[in-house]
Amino acid sequence: MEDKKIAMEETIRSIFDFIGDDRHREGLLDTPKRVVKSWDKLYSGYTQDPREILGTVFEDGACDEMVVLKNIEFYSMCEHHMLPFFGKVSIGYIPDQKVVGISKLARLVEVFARRLQIQEKMTGQIADTLMEVLQPKGAMVVAEATHMCMVMRGVEKQQSVMVTSAVRGLFKRDARTREEFMGHIRH
């Protein structure tokens, strides 16, 4: 792993050359190490199994009402431009037998967000993992995010927000269930 980090640091120095900066100037001397260290966290989702994040579940047949955790802040990196996108995710599910601690839902968002990603895929991955591990009656995930690839380059639209949703099980079949979830996350 150390050899990979050294090679990556040299790659960062090559980027300085490519953009026309001086790799030897004082402000850039430690930048390659800092970039590699920051990438350890930014891309830490590759080292985690999302199913294990939800691994501790509680069997609770009495809980059959909607569970919602909203406004889970996240940041991710666009797989097309390697620029950040960030925003909030809201998750809802209706347990069948299993519930999970709410911090696990936030960690599930993080594990998928900390990968090169597109928002549409991330939203679906969160919902699919909930369905696989918790086997609820249904799940719904809504993500809202600002994409720096649209803010800093391309069309340069600073106020645009992308909204994606993933709808599974009862949420997909029953409009009232979707409406209840949307009512919870609007307030």
UniProtKB/Swiss-Prot annotation:
Zn(2+) binds at residues 78, 81, 149. GO terms for cellular component: cytoplasm. Coiled coil: none annotated. GO terms for biological process: one-carbon metabolic process; tetrahydrobiopterin biosynthetic process; tetrahydrofolate biosynthetic process. PROSITE patterns: GTP_CYCLOHYDROL_1_1, GTP_CYCLOHYDROL_1_2. It is an enzyme of class 3 (hydrolase). Keywords: GTP-binding, Hydrolase, Metal-binding, Nucleotide-binding, One-carbon metabolism, Zinc. The keyword Ribonucleoprotein does not apply. Belongs to the GTP cyclohydrolase I family. This is GTP cyclohydrolase 1.
